[in-house]
Curated annotation (Swiss-Prot):
<feature type="transmembrane region" description="Helical">
    <location>
        <begin position="102"/>
        <end position="122"/>
    </location>
</feature>
<dbReference type="GO" id="GO:0005743">
    <property type="term" value="C:mitochondrial inner membrane"/>
</dbReference>
<dbReference type="Pfam" id="PF00146">
    <property type="entry name" value="NADHdh"/>
</dbReference>
<keyword id="KW-0830">Ubiquinone</keyword>
<keyword id="KW-1278">Translocase</keyword>
<dbReference type="GO" id="GO:0009060">
    <property type="term" value="P:aerobic respiration"/>
</dbReference>
<comment type="function">
    <text>Core subunit of the mitochondrial membrane respiratory chain NADH dehydrogenase (Complex I) that is believed to belong to the minimal assembly required for catalysis. Complex I functions in the transfer of electrons from NADH to the respiratory chain. The immediate electron acceptor for the enzyme is believed to be ubiquinone.</text>
</comment>
<feature type="transmembrane region" description="Helical">
    <location>
        <begin position="225"/>
        <end position="245"/>
    </location>
</feature>
<dbReference type="InterPro" id="IPR001694">
    <property type="entry name" value="NADH_UbQ_OxRdtase_su1/FPO"/>
</dbReference>
<comment type="similarity">
    <text>Belongs to the complex I subunit 1 family.</text>
</comment>
<keyword id="KW-1133">Transmembrane helix</keyword>
<feature type="transmembrane region" description="Helical">
    <location>
        <begin position="72"/>
        <end position="92"/>
    </location>
</feature>
<dbReference type="GO" id="GO:0008137">
    <property type="term" value="F:NADH dehydrogenase (ubiquinone) activity"/>
</dbReference>
<keyword id="KW-0812">Transmembrane</keyword>
<feature type="transmembrane region" description="Helical">
    <location>
        <begin position="254"/>
        <end position="274"/>
    </location>
</feature>
<keyword id="KW-0472">Membrane</keyword>
<keyword id="KW-0999">Mitochondrion inner membrane</keyword>
Length: 319
């Protein structure tokens, strides 16, 4: 029992530390892009800012408005963080916590479950702003999961299996980014929408919905939603890295880990750069982009990936 608990903690704590410093990186980057310093008081160069923010949020009194549903209100952020942590289990870094045969499929299934916590949070808040924000988030997440699923299917047809290790083996000689760059481009934009990041941050909608589905949250529960959002950003970028720009063969674990961290960091910084550079989309444009542009494109590319091995009599390797 004790080794299992320690093993899980050793997995969760580094993720939370990475999330904390990603928030600092975002504030620093936004600061420098707006010609200011960003956090620079707490600790050397402001490095202790995320720890101070965390302490402040978790020691604040959790205010619960009278009209809310208490059980769902508290369980939603806990469920959100649990699902965000569960997604990490099948990811090889270079060894996965649980080596699943259907690793990619399980990641897709767990990420779909995260929608429930957002919907519950909006409904339990009993506020019109929160429910509109949560409905937007659910519609957006479910819609973009369609393209993510089709892109994953196309990649799986190329690799010939559902395991994450097979992806690194397939990319020993060339990255899948070079052969499937339209899919990689659409995948990256879909991950932005899936994680509700700018320019697709319509769930927050500061000008109209105050803060979206988490408007009634304060203190600890709000911090849990905050951690969930940034953990999802990192895990999506990890997935992008493994799918399209392989970190290398797992036979060299140290090199694999350094490569994986570096590439994930570059992708995460591009998320922050996009937030600082682009204005928000209108909601109809967001849905138009998916249903009228991405969906036909991904489906046609999926058909192409399916027909190519058959037409050239080259059946993918069976694991």
């Amino acid at each position: 029992m004790l080794p299992t608990t320690i093993n899980s903690l050793m997995y969760i704590i580094p993720i939370l530390i990475a999330v904390a410093f990603l928030t600092l990186m975002e504030r620093k980057m936004l600061g420098y892009m707006q010609l200011r310093k960003g956090p620079n008081i707490t600790g050397p160069y402001g490095l202790l800012q995320p720890i101070a923010d965390g302490l402040k949020l978790f020691t604040k009194e959790p205010i619960r408005p009278l009209h809310t549903s208490p059980t769902l209100l508290i369980s939603s952020p806990i469920l959100a963080l649990t699902t965000a942590m569960l997604i990490w289990t099948p990811i090889p870094m270079p060894y996965a916590l649980t080596n699943l045969n259907l690793g990619l499929l399980s990641i897709l299934a767990i990420s779909s479950m995260a929608v429930n916590s957002i919907l519950w949070a909006g409904w339990a808040s009993n506020s019109k702003y929160a429910i509109i924000g949560s409905l937007r988030a659910v519609a957006q997440t479910i819609s973009y999961e369609v393209t993510l699923g089709i892109i994953l299917l196309s990649i799986l047809i190329l690799t010939g299996g559902f395991t994450m290790q097979l992806l690194t083996t397939t990319q020993e000689f060339t990255w899948l980014l070079t052969t499937s760059w339209p899919l990689a481009m659409m995948w990256f934009i879909s991950t932005l929408a899936e994680t509700n990041r700018a320019p697709f941050d319509l769930t927050e909608g500061e000008s109209e919905l105050v803060s979206g589905f988490n408007v009634e949250y304060a203190g600890g529960p709000f911090a849990l939603f905050f951690l969930t959002e940034y953990a999802n950003i990192i895990v999506m970028n990890l997935l992008t890295c493994i799918l399209f720009i392989s970190p290398g063969p797992p036979q060299h674990p140290e090199l694999f880990l350094i490569n994986l961290i570096t590439k994930t960091m570059i992708l995460s910084l591009s998320f922050l750069w996009i937030r600082a550079s682009y204005p928000s989309f209108r909601y109809d444009q967001l849905m138009h982009l998916l249903w009228k542009q991405f969906l036909p494109l991904t489906m046609s590319l999926c058909l192409l990936h399916t027909s190519l091995p058959i037409s050239t009599s080259g059946i993918p390797p069976l694991s």
